[in-house]
Amino acid sequence: MEKMGLNQVREAYLKFFESKGHLRLPSFSVVPKNDKSLLLINAGMAPLKPYFTGLQTPPRKRVTTCQKCIRTGDIENVGKTSRHATFFEMMGNFSFGDYFKNEVIPWAWEFTTEVLKLPKEKLYVTIYLDDDEAYDIWTSKTDVDPKHIFRLGKEDNFWEHGVGPCGPCSEIHFYKDNGEIKSAEEFIEKSDADRAVEFWNLVFTQFDKDEDGNYNRLEFPNIDTGMGLERMATIMQGVETIFEVDTIKSILDKVAALANTKYGEDELKDVSLRIITDHVRSVSVMISDEVLPSNEGRGYVLRRLLRRAARHGKLLGIKGTFLYKIVDSVIENSGEAYPELKEKKDYIKKVISIEEERFAETIDSGMEILKEYIEDLEKNNKKVLSGEKVFKLYDTYGFPLELTEEILEEKGITVDMDSFNKEMKEQRERARAARSESTYMGTDVKILDTIPSEIETTFDGYENLELQSKVKVIIKDDAFADCINKGEKGIIVTDRTPFYAEMGGQIGDKGTISADGFMAKVQDCKNNIGGKIVHFVEVTEGSIKLEDEVLLEVDRKRRENIGKNHSATHLLHAALRKVVGEHVHQSGSYVDEDKLRFDFTHFESLTHEELKKVEDLVNDTIESVWDVVTKEMTIEEAKNSGAMALFDEKYGDKVRVVKMGDFSTELCGGTHISNVGKIGLFKIVSESGIAAGTRRIEAVTGHKALEFIEHKSDLLRQIASMLKCSEKDIINRLNQQNAELKDKDKEISALKSKLASGSEDDILKNIKEVKGVKLAVAALKDVDGEALRNLGDKIKNKIESGVVVLGSEVEGKVQFIAMASKDVVSKGVHCGTIVREIAKIAGGGGGGRPDMAQAGGRLPEKLNDAINEVENIMENLVK
């Protein structure tokens, strides 16, 4: 392996795929076009979505790009770690209904091992659990070590987003350490520790997922790949972090020179150097793509990056404006790849300079005031700065809250967010536009974690489903409030609650909070980071204020159904250990009022017999009508009692043990029914693999189980009615019908062959010659598959030397076949080329050998145009 610069890697990649027939497209702007779902382009395929969805026709079916991307979701970590960045480049090769796995996998291996010359013994491949096709191609068309291929589940190797196109993926990884990874479990460990580094993801978009969750095969599958350029450069240069990569290090060295310091000597200074280096790359690209600083949307992202970088310049002791001086270094390293940087060099510098000057006018005076605030707090031995003072900095001096928090954090000081949010209602929209944290009913999740620690909330809902309590906290519109009124959504925190907060895989309770003239629906219940129980509410009547007494009532029926499913999960766990083996352990679960999901360790799918045994064992236990007994004890006492605990869960001094007869004993903080008999019925709905060594069972209980069985019974009745037989005779009747259908298929095939033979004489009468080579062509109707091939064979045998090209419209689509005698193949004829070119005209694709090939198309109206083009293609092929 030879060292390669970042720019060399990019060029090598794009050139390689150009040599494979790809059109090299320049990077799209980081500003999305006609895509309101994105603030900024954050992935290589994002600008190509219209081509993948069919809304637009791509300029070529094979495309390769290196795309500029901006991601700010982890902005707080940028600089503090050596791998986070807001700007990165994503290389990709894409196929829009052209090639597929057979081509892209060998190409990926060829580029990795022959162009980049990465040592094969350092390379590891992951594929989707059930993707045998990918495994066969990896092992037959490349020389990858089969022991270096690991199968993983959906979470790692299957790409889908709701309904629509989706598919499995295959990733290539570089192992940094010596030795060999011997198992999927070890591989996951090494990957999590950044020792096995994923550098290329090949996504095989071969399914269309419908609203019912069915995966339907796409007629023309797509390829979407992504290789992070900076990450690949770290591998090629043998460095650990992106900030050591040649082009990025060059920019960092420029920043260090301006700060009169050296990278690697002081970690605090290194953080600032990394932040400035990354942020200047981002802002240069954003400005070159016409983003300007503002107080909303992507303009606010730009402003925040600029001001964060400027502030870290101050920390490094850099005097005056300086960010614009680094732009030359950015352009020097990236200008060839992105000429817009060169073209707009002066413009970029000017925008940065103006924004930096504006901030400089406020930051010096703001810093002086903040310094006074900090000194005053330290003098009085206090650790909380009032929200009023923080708001004054923000409102009067343009000091972003994030910047104030960051500076205070370095001094161990926090902000009184309660009073700050009261002062800042009118500024909420600005903050929301820039934040990436998810929201619930208009409430910023981040604010939940600022509930004062002295506010205590107690869960009293194991025995009580309703109780009186006092309102201690109200949050609405991203701020703490004194009251909440009819029509408003928000959060209510009380000192006691019967509502179970989502935890341990169990969904949160729903219900109501009420008082005289007041009613609110509790739509969810969660814990904040500090363990406070918060109720997400929508007020339907009246209003409530802090310290008011309220009645909290849990939806009893829903809680009972959740309890049935949770208790059934414990029984399922115990049954699996008895039927499958003691190696079975829970690796995840989800319980709501309708169903349960249980993930467990096991290395193969369960047989029908095993599933039946598990289901029967759970139902036998339900019939035993054991009480569900709960008891608090120490963790040691619990373990001595035989209780199962989850190794990755954290437990306190006292734990809650849930026991169901002699069948199941587990540590659990969730809610359950009082007796296993109340579960009623347990029914397994599905069993599947989600990762190597991890299986998933989904099941239903009680009335939902009855509904499931009734639905299956209804289906059987409908099928029996359609087949005109009794339910017990369905299988025999289906076997009989299959046999009859096979006989009919043979008859139809024979008739089609006869029909096709009727065209034989006409085709032979109209044989043409192209440069001395006989050419038999025809456009037919309703001649498909075997009949079309048989007709082609007959004509080829009769003309002895020459080419036969036939096209036929069948059920709204087009089929093509081409055949050639060996002597004309030696003259340059290639059937694969012929069908590929004519299939394009009919909106399809295909290929094959020089002497025989077939293809398909979806535009029957173009059949004659396609067949008429054969003569021209032959003119170019025949030597």
From Swiss-Prot:
Where is Zn(2+) bound in this sequence? H566, H570, C668, H672
Chief localization: cytoplasm
UniProt remark on cofactor binding = Binds 1 zinc ion per subunit.
One matching Pfam family = DHHA1
Please name the SMART domains in this protein's record: tRNA_SAD
This protein's superkingdom? Bacteria
* Cofactor(s) this protein cannot do without: Zn(2+)
Would I find Protein transport among this entry's keywords?
no
> Coiled-coil intervals in this record?
none
* Signal peptide range in chain numbering: none
Broadest EC class? ligase
Recorded hits in InterPro entries, A to Z, give: aa-tRNA-synth_II/BPL/LPL, Ala-tRNA-lgiase_IIc, Ala-tRNA-ligase_IIc_anticod-bd, Ala-tRNA-synth_IIc_core, Ala-tRNA-synth_IIc_N, Ala-tRNA_ligase, Ala_tRNA_ligase_euk/bac, DHHA1_dom
Instruction: Spell out the subcellular localization from the entry.
Output: Cytoplasm
Q: Which Gene3D superfamilies match?
A: 2.40.30.130, 3.10.310.40, 3.30.54.20, 6.10.250.550, Bira Bifunctional Protein, Domain 2, Threonyl-trna Synthetase, Chain A, domain 2
What EC numbers are recorded for this enzyme? 6.1.1.7
GO CC list: cytosol
* Presence of the UniProt keyword tRNA-binding in the record: yes
Q: Which UniProt keywords apply?
A: Aminoacyl-tRNA synthetase, ATP-binding, Cytoplasm, Ligase, Metal-binding, Nucleotide-binding, Protein biosynthesis, RNA-binding, tRNA-binding, Zinc
SUPFAM superfamilies reported in the protein's UniProt record: Class II aaRS and biotin synthetases, Putative anticodon-binding domain of alanyl-tRNA synthetase (AlaRS), ThrRS/AlaRS common domain, Translation proteins
Its function?
Catalyzes the attachment of alanine to tRNA(Ala) in a two-step reaction: alanine is first activated by ATP to form Ala-AMP and then transferred to the acceptor end of tRNA(Ala). Also edits incorrectly charged Ser-tRNA(Ala) and Gly-tRNA(Ala) via its editing domain.
Give the family, as the similarity comment puts it. Belongs to the class-II aminoacyl-tRNA synthetase family.
Record remark: domains: Consists of three domains; the N-terminal catalytic domain, the editing domain and the C-terminal C-Ala domain. The editing domain removes incorrectly charged amino acids, while the C-Ala domain, along with tRNA(Ala), serves as a bridge to cooperatively bring together the editing and aminoacylation centers thus stimulating deacylation of misacylated tRNAs.
HAMAP family according to UniProt: Ala_tRNA_synth_B (MF_00036_B)
What is this protein's record name? Alanine--tRNA ligase
Q: Which organism is it from?
A: Clostridium novyi (strain NT)
Lineage of origin: Bacteria, Bacillati, Bacillota, Clostridia, Eubacteriales
